[in-house]
Amino acid sequence: MIPDKLEQNFFEDTYYEKRVWIASARLSNSLMMFSKTFVGEDDEMGRNAVNDILVTLSESEIVPKYIVFWNNAVKLCVEDSELLSVINRLEKYGVRILVAGHALDKLNLKSSLRVGKLANHFDLIDAINQVQKVINF
């Protein structure tokens, strides 16, 4: 029997849905560190790469224990960032989002922080020392 169009669409929509729910996300003993708002070159592809990495991570079954945003990457955690909902989702999964206060101060963005914990250098070093793997973007 050939499935009708409704059944086919249901399968396709279900198959491509996001695979992670808060209850099933597991924390790996790792830390991801973002220092820029792009990966590689500062062009459309580089900016899309950061977006793609964070969105894919938010749909993964295993997420890092920490994600650190420092230098210009703190801009991803402030008001009007296109990635706020994605980073919020990761935080709800239990990922500890650390945002460098020094960078926010230098960029005059401290009052615009909307996701994550304001962190000092001691917090950042402590997080790095708690994990087995640090991934730097």
Give the role of each language-model region:
Residues 54, 84-88, 125:
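Short amphipathic alpha-helical segments and helix-helix/interface helices
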Residues 83-109:
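A glycine-rich helix N-cap at a beta->alpha junction
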Residues 28, 64, 94, 131-132:
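Short, well-ordered alpha-helix to beta-strand connector turns
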Residues 1-16, 26:
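Helix-enriched interaction subdomains in cytosolic or periplasmic regions
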